[in-house]
A protein has these predicted regions:
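Short, acidic/charged, Gly/Pro-enriched secondary-structure junctions
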Residues: 70-99, 116
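Helix-start/capping segments and mature chain N-termini
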Residues: 1-65, 69-76, 102-187
Length: 187
């Protein structure tokens, strides 16, 4: 429960909804930031806000807010939360509209910011060590897609890699880039 900021309004958590024909649902046209907040302070908050805007530019999802405006929105969400140690998710996406094909310039870019309590990503593994799988999936070449954007569509590689790891009893997968060099884990 609580509130999510959506398109300029605070919306009750359970009422924050998007249409089934939202472009992002069909084509992955969204960008986001996942941020940790400790004691009411978001770690490297402005850097995240700037990266969100940059990701939007790279993915042709022009975010209709400045980094400073996003900072105020995130601060408001953190202030009304019931706890001060949070995970903050800022998300921008192409909404529903007249374009349901791949191109979506006429669909409004929407934005939301939510915050919730979310423990350590690896749980107890941060104390015991994590068992890692080497994923069969590779991070794409930067000539394929703007892979430096934090874009939802790119995260399907992470989802597949994480599922692969869990099916083998591992905490996570380590992914290589298109050249065979270590790139990242899924989270």
């Amino acid at each position: 429960d609580g509130y999510i900021w959506m398109d300029g309004n605070l919306v009750e958590w359970r009422n924050a909804k998007v249409h089934i024909l939202t472009h992002a649902m069909h084509y992955g046209s969204s960008v986001f930031e996942g941020e940790r907040c400790y004691g009411g302070k978001i770690f490297k908050s402005m850097e995240h806000s700037k990266r969100l805007i940059q990701s939007g530019k790279l993915m042709d999802i022009p975010i209709p807010y400045t980094a400073e405006e996003i900072e105020k929105i995130k601060s408001k969400i953190v202030d009304i939360a019931e706890t001060s140690d949070l995970y903050v998710r800022a998300l921008a996406w192409r909404g529903s509209g007249t374009d349901m094909g791949v191109a979506s310039e006429n669909n409004k870019v929407r934005m939301a910011v939510a915050a919730w309590e979310w423990g350590a990503y690896y749980g107890d593994a941060k104390f015991k060590g994590a068992k890692l799988n080497i994923s069969r999936w590779k991070r794409p070449s930067p000539e394929t897609i703007p892979c430096f954007a934090k874009a939802a569509g790119l995260y399907m590689i992470c989802t597949q890699s994480k599922h692969e790891a869990q099916s083998k009893g591992c905490s996570d997968s380590l992914m290589m880039d298109y050249r065979g060099y270590v790139a990242e884990a899924t989270g």
